[in-house]
């Protein structure tokens, strides 16, 4: 019969996690995060507190700042985090683009972006959906044409959460239209301060 009880080391880890979360996810931060007017401040402060503890990116390889937690430790952390109502770190930087950079990025890209993601020095947003391409990303039309050493982009993205805060966007664009529509799609990292980028708000029911 399987023994599902926590080991002494895991119990000690649970105590450490519980104590940290009790102190780090305080009422003031929870209120800041839960208010749409101050959400940006809260969404920056929470991962900063996790960073100083060394827990902002537990799923990363240790060499880049991960924790090497066991499956049980990850379960303990997420269970305790949920119990106090603390959110996951916004996924765009620490989970989505970082995973791609770690797996496929050059050494230069890793050195440039990963430390800044860990320290929450960059806000990332996701540029996938387009006015005519949502769930079917193979239908995307935003073009990126290589001119010299730079790509020139033409097109629009939509439903780009937190674009109003972001200084970087990871974007799917079409670099080749000669094959099937599922081909010729490239993943680009784009500085939101690049010339020609305009961010427009979409009014939603919650303001």
For the regions a language model picked out, list residue spans one by one.
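Short, intrinsically disordered, charge-balanced linker/junction segments flanking boundaries
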Residues: 204-207
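N-terminal glycine-rich flavin-associated loop
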Residues: 89-108, 134
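Buried hydrophobic positions in well-ordered alpha/beta secondary-structure cores of metabolic enzymes
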Residues: 10, 21, 54, 61, ...
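Active-site-adjacent elements of ketosynthase-type condensing enzymes
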Residues: 132-140
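A short, Trp-centered hydrophobic/proline-enriched beta-strand micro-motif
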Residues: 120-128
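A short core secondary-structure module
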Residues: 141, 149-150, 154-200
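Short, well-ordered beta-strand elements within core beta-sheets of diverse protein domains
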Residues: 2-4, 99-105, 143
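Amphipathic, small/basic residue-rich leader segments at the start of a protein or domain
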Residues: 1-92, 108, 112-119
């Amino acid at each position: 019969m399987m023994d599902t009880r926590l080991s002494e080391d895991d119990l000690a880890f649970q105590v450490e996690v519980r104590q940290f979360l009790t102190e780090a996810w305080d009422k003031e931060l929870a209120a800041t995060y839960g208010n749409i007017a101050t959400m940006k401040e809260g969404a920056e402060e929470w991962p900063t507190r996790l960073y100083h503890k060394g827990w902002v990116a537990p799923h990363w390889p240790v060499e880049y700042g991960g924790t090497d937690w066991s499956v049980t430790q990850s379960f303990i952390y997420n269970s305790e985090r949920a119990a106090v109502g603390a959110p996951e770190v916004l996924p765009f930087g620490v989970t989505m683009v970082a995973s791609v950079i770690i797996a496929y990025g050059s050494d230069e890209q890793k050195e440039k972006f990963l430390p800044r993601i860990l320290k929450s020095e960059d806000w990332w947003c996701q540029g996938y959906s387009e006015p005519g391409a949502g769930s079917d990303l193979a239908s995307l039309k935003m073009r990126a044409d290589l001119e010299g050493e730079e790509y020139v982009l033409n097109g629009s993205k939509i439903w780009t959460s937190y674009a109003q805060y972001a200084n970087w966007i990871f974007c799917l664009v079409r670099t080749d239209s000669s094959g099937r529509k599922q081909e010729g799609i490239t993943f680009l990292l784009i500085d939101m301060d690049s010339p020609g980028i305009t961010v427009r708000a979409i009014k939603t029911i919650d303001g």
